[in-house]
């Protein structure tokens, strides 16, 4: 059943909008790429504003959009229009994948985002978000307002990354976002699967680099 009232979700959304991130502001100004804030907030209302004990934050959507946009811009500057392959672990409701899809769309660059999660894409369920107040939905239904981006850029895969990633064919992974399991062993496994298919200049972005909460991620990255 829904975890909160509509009023509570809207209150949380209003509060998280007030957060400021000077380092991300500087990053956006330095690169010249920044996601449309209103677009981001609307997507987050349906995919990131949830009931949980830890503080709400979806600033990683800004980082992903800017990092991928800069990567695309640098490739386009060398006249490379090669179709990009992007991997994401930890789809959840689809927020991060859509932020990356928006970067591809805004820079008019071909690419495919393969996103992996244990949660099914086409099974009706509650998602701990404001949409639960309507009725249980599949992820596909939850993301219907952004269905054009989903159709053009995103492929959803269900399963444990330890079992699924080795079976997925990809000669090269240009860009990756790791937000799946947060143990050192799992992060290193995903990293090893990706780095073997990357070339100099390709990127991996890690979520939740916080020593107190996720020391395994910090250890893997460092």
List where the protein language model places each region.
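N-terminal auxiliary segments of SAM/dcSAM-dependent transferases
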Residues: 1-31
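Generic detection of intrinsically disordered/low-complexity segments and helix-coil linkers/edges
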Residues: 3, 33, 200-203
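S-adenosylmethionine/decaboxylated-SAM
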Residues: 9, 13, 38-40, 44-55, ...
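Short alpha-helical hairpin
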Residues: 25-45
